[in-house]
Amino acid sequence: MSQILRRYPLLNDASAMYIHEKDNWTAFRWNATELTAILEEVNRKQGLLYGRLSSLGFDSKLKAMAENLTYDVVYSSEIEGIRLNVDEVRSSIARKLGIENVKQTAPSHYIDSVVAVMLDAVNHYDQILTKEKICAWQAAFFPTGFSEGSQIEVGQYRTNEEHIVSGMFGREKIHYIAPSPERVDEEMAHFLDWFNSQENISSVIRSAIAHFWFVSIHPFEDGNGRLARILSDMLLARADKSEFRFYNISSQINKDKNRYYNILEKAQHGDGDITEWIYWYANTLSVALDEAENIVSTILNKSFFWQKVSSVPLSQRQTDMLNLFLDGYEAKITSKTWASLAKCSKDTAIRDIQDLVDKDILREDIPGAKRPSYSIIYDPEDITVFFSDVTIEQQNGNHYIKAMYKGRLKVCERILPLDAERFEKGDLPLENLLAKYCSYLRIS
């Protein structure tokens, strides 16, 4: 546990309102017994994820990381109320990573700056973190020196008091008052010493502590939350010993922002026992790993498909449309949908689709239907013979296909709501559903 001692007096514990007002406040405590199960779950999921990723080639791994980083950047900003264009972020990341065949959308200078910060942290996870580095990252978030129309201090620690408030003007509620600006330099020196040190505790706990500690210091006038999430990711990367990042916590925090802020506030008003915060953080990370599994499944299924049809001649439009649906675009493949998305005539769409049917790349879901829809043929072999006990279940608002593969491997894959609905209605055959979500199991 952290044992950083102070060299100046603070309030006695009885009169302290915020955690940083207590003497030796960074000697955080937690109940290891209460955390054992969730930490084991996270470690198990990390192992499974990286085990699956071992079957991917370098290019596929790079694409998986790019997709993860895209949503990390987007959702970390959205937590702070900043909406970024997903295509611009994806394009910026792809260009910086040297990934081809990604829709090119010219990103703004701001998005390029934010992406550069994330990639710097990811690519140099094992380097010493310095005051100069973290100040440069904060400055990159605010290239104009303004935030929400107000000029702020950038590239340096704050020199003003920092109050975390909510509510209308005149009716503000103060949630937290950060350490005084006179303390920030020394507080951050203590934090950076700890961050760069080696400590024999769980990487998940270290990541959670870094997040909590940094936002509690609140060293900058703005950008603290985004930086805290980057720093916690860096510690996870150090533990993984890999610059490849395939999961992030930002997307899950964004779905539960109120709980995120409430549990931070509770810990910041506490006595140094941050068990509840660490548990919430680890549980949120566990959900993030589930999300990463879904992304990896999509990439593996897509890779399996293109291996099968690599020698089949296709037009660029057909390739682009197939990639769109392989990436999980939620719509039935019909001539109307095809024409709309490909921006071509319906007659052209019909010819494209019929050509793919003739080449055994698409097949009708219900042969002879008045308004035909189609599914991608991932594998010409009927893979239903390899599965038993297939069910569609709903959990926490998501739909999953569950089955037993070859009588020995339990499979659970999240599926699109539209596919679940179509399957229940009988519009989507089981063979097509299993092929779409479970073909990766056929990779030898």
Could you tell me what each predicted segment is?
Residues 1-400, 412, 428-434, 440-444:
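FIC/Doc superfamily catalytic core
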Residues 404-422:
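Acidic, low-complexity, intrinsically disordered interaction modules
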